Amino acid sequence: MISSASDPFSAISSNFLCGKELNAIKVNLLKERNYPEIFDGFGWCTWNAFYKEVTSRKIYNKLDEFKEKGIKIKWLLVDDGWQQFDDRKLLSIKEDPVKFPEGLKAFTQKVKEEYGVRYVGVWHAFEGYWAGIHKDGELYKTHKDMFFETPTGWIVPGETEEKAFKFWDMQHSYLKEQGIDFVKVDNQAAASNKYDNILPGATAASILHTAVEKSVFKNFNGAMINCMGSKMENILTRPKSAISRNSDDFYPNAEHGFITHIVQNVYVSPVHNQIHHCDFDMFWTKHKTATVSAVLRAISGGPVYVSDEVGNTKAEQLKPLVTPNGDIWRFENAAMVTKELFYTDCSKAEVPLKVWNKSGDNFVVAAFGITPDKTVKGSFKLSDIPNADDKYLVHDFFSDRYFILKSGEKIDLETEYNACALYSLYKIADDNTVKIGDKTYYAEGADPNPKTVLLNDIL
């Protein structure tokens, strides 16, 4: 299918809608997927804090820090490292008793009751673990009927939907009994390769995604984060799960990691967001890119969470991002590059990378400096975003200034490397009133409780 439109976003959307109407796309489009309420709150993930050396004691230490600093987190994700594995292969569906000596159920109870964290989730791989299931482990010996041995010797979830579902339902039912509320399912793009010479890749992906989602919806009401699965055979075979990681990992020690991260996210999202709400991944609040990372997550339209090490969460970085009760304000789409930069490498072109999103009649636009060690200049016009009106009230977040922007006018931009500008655009009603959000938040344009003011009273 080929679509023609006045902007690339409309053309891409038209293609997906047409594909759905022709039954070429057999899974739900974005509007048919329900965003889990869990991820309307602020979260913390163990990954960049502990990597595979995660333990319950270390997690309690981090939660003590959040408590002392008055930071409310709504959900906690225990990432890779909590399970029993050997040689990158899964031994059991149960937690590692050395790392979680009190047991997973007692751990989740303590996290919820003593620390006030409402939801706890865990990570697991699509194949069981990175290299599948261990042949000498309790899991395989007891439940061989749920698995499939490939011609190359991998032990993976069964090659039929029924067998794969039996495995994941067993695992997820156990996790649910321990108080787990959601899962992150990782390494999805590589999974179908394990079934080479047995099933076509797209068929294998469809079987696996259908089976795992059937279990997730049975046990967790659909609350999951899909991860490492941006191949189209993954995106187009997930029946109805809502959230999918939109980029490679956040790498805190990569010298210019933010460039790669933002470019992947805002250029992939125009396609990915046709099916899924996009997860822009975690970040650190104590980091040279903390502010730009927080702004990007605030306007991303997806989950907002950090992975700070113990002692390293900077509460002041979270104040414009998270409400005191741990809520976040989400825009309705995934954040995307502005249309005139759709085919531009902003880092090499030495211009600000402009990113937009919307909430109802409001827009948000951020301009990021992503050319190393250089200050870059550019401009923003209303024509840079699709379907904008002729006039808006604009709030410049970092200078705390309100002004009017009309069609044909421009905002001059000048951004340093690892810095950004942020503008909220408010629709002006016929009676010259404007519904404005709380200007102390990056996502003010998505404030669920805006106040109505007269234009003359704010300019």
PLM-predicted stretches and their roles:
Residues 1-30, 35:
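Extended acidic/polar, glycine-enriched regions
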Residues 37-199:
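Aromatic-lined carbohydrate-binding/catalytic grooves of carbohydrate-active enzymes
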Residues 50-54, 83-86, 127-133, 190-194, ...:
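Flexible loop/turn segments at secondary-structure boundaries
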Residues 104-114, 203-224:
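Alpha-helix-loop-beta-strand connector modules within alpha/beta enzyme cores
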Residues 133-177, 210-315, 336-337, 345:
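Glycan-recognition surfaces
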Residues 186, 391-408:
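Solvent-exposed beta-strand/loop surfaces of large extracellular or lumenal domains
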Residues 297-300, 305, 343-390, 418, ...:
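Carbohydrate-binding surface patches
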Residues 409-413, 421:
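Short strand-edge motifs at loop-to-beta-strand transitions and within beta-strands
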